[in-house]
């Protein structure tokens, strides 16, 4: 019997993730569904958990939001996002395409709530590639249900403040739910997607 997997992602990512899923060629059925905000993602999980074998969740915070709530069915969950090496490549590709870019003025949104700096310079030079994931994981583990619900608004407000104060030129975004609002404010954004092989490896864990 074929496994059933549900991928939960933001509305913005539903189409590109559906395209990636179509290229996986795995011996399972993967359905891609969307959520609107961290406060409601557990409801989306619950609506599918009774009839699925596992979940792919877009982002560690979204996964933490689900795990912070009690559920009638506890299915295996893995989170997916671009990995650290992929973020490095995305930033280096930006620099190669435009040598005039100032890495001090490119902001990585997911680093805003975490101590250690949120610029591309901080990520590329001050944060060791081998220590970034544990650093983020430790912060994620300390999150509470209340703090999770406020993260996106906090990050969005800080990015708008920085943009209005001319403190940045671009956002490398991983909180995909805030992308429409960032673009409505005219803030240049990029969203690097995880690779097909990365999603395939995670799906095989379920």
Model-flagged regions — what are they?
Residues 1-206:
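Alpha-helical/coil-rich non-catalytic "connector" segments in signaling and regulatory proteins
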